[in-house]
Every structure is written in structure tokens, then in C-alpha cells.
């Protein structure tokens, strides 16, 4: 059960949306469609994520497995400018210092064992700035991010960094 919870947490880390922007990540006035959580919400940013999901080789009563530790990554607008960075526990900090904490409220089906799942996060923002008022974040269209093989006794305690790309869409 512990292994499943850890795997699900890790799977929930990626995203991309079908909303347009003018290159700076600001989304033209559109409302979200798709999952129930974002239906009717307004998409305001759509940034691409590049980074790594970090896992540690751990052991429990079922054997060795890769335990999710944290993401490391940056969120870029369509011109490649850094807009935010991913933080521990699904947090995000924007370039202006505003930040949000997030918790998973919805996840999509597995598209591939190697790819993170689509996930919807409910958020709490802190500080004034570009993330102020963001209520939801959806991570979509992830490529990579998941370990493909289990770890062994000789790897216990070692870290594994799995590259990923995704799209993060922010909603008010």
C-alpha cells in the first residue's frame, strides 16, 4: 500500500493544456474545459515544465522500490523565459516571489509506465504577485518522469533522477 501511495504521488507530477498564449505564458481569455475540477475556471498561464523527478531506493515488506522524494524543475513561457520553479511537496514559486502550495485532487489514467499522469492540484497562494488568486493547477502531457525498473539492494539509499517535460496550466 505504501508503495502504491508513493507511486501515485509520483505519477501525479506532469501537465499540458490546449490553451493558447501570446508567448509569455499569459492565456487569452478562455475558460477551462475537461475535468470537473477546472470546468468554468479561467486559465491564466500555460507554462512548460522541464526538470527531473527525484526518487530514492527504499525497502519495505514487499521489497525494494523507488520512493518519490521531490521534483526539480523550472516552468518556462513559450519564449523560453523562466517564470517559476517547482518546489518540494508540489509547491511552485514564481519569478516575482509569489508562491503556492498544492494538493492533488484529481488524477488521470496512466498513459505509459514511463510518463507522469495528468494531475489537478488545488492550491493556496501566498504573497502578492503573479500567482495570487490561482485556485487550480493542471499538469498535463507529461513525457518521462517515472523510473522504468525497480531498484536493488545494492542501490538502497541511492537517488535516481528521471528527466521529464510537461505543461502546467494555472487557473483562477
Where are the regions that the model predicts?
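Positively charged n-region of N-terminal signal peptides that target proteins for export
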Residues: 1-4
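C-terminal motif of bacterial Sec signal peptides marking the signal peptidase cleavage site
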Residues: 14-15
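Primary mode marks residue(s) on the alpha4-beta5-alpha5 output face of response regulator receiver
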Residues: 23-54, 61-172
Amino acid at each position: 500500500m505504501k508503495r502504491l501511495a508513493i507511486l501515485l504521488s509520483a505519477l501525479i507530477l506532469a501537465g499540458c493544456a490546449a490553451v493558447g498564449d501570446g508567448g509569455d505564458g499569459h492565456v487569452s481569455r478562455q475558460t477551462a474545459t475537461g475535468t470537473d475540477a477546472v470546468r468554468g475556471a479561467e486559465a491564466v498561464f500555460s507554462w512548460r515544465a522541464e526538470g527531473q523527478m527525484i526518487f530514492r531506493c527504499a525497502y519495505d515488506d514487499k521489497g525494494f522500490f523507488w520512493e518519490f522524494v521531490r521534483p526539480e524543475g523550472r516552468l518556462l513561457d513559450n519564449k523560453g523565459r523562466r517564470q517559476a520553479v517547482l518546489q518540494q511537496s508540489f509547491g511552485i514559486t514564481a519569478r516575482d516571489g509569489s508562491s503556492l502550495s498544492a494538493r492533488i485532487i484529481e488524477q488521470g489514467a496512466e498513459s505509459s509506465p514511463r510518463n507522469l499522469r495528468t494531475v489537478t492540484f488545488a492550491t493556496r497562494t501566498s504573497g502578492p504577485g503573479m500567482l495570487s488568486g490561482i485556485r487550480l493547477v493542471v499538469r498535463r502531457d507529461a513525457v518521462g518522469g517515472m523510473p522504468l525498473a525497480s531498484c536493488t539492494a545494492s542501490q538502497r539509499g541511492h537517488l535516481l533522477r528521471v528527466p521529464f517535460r510537461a505543461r502546467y496550466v494555472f487557473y483562477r
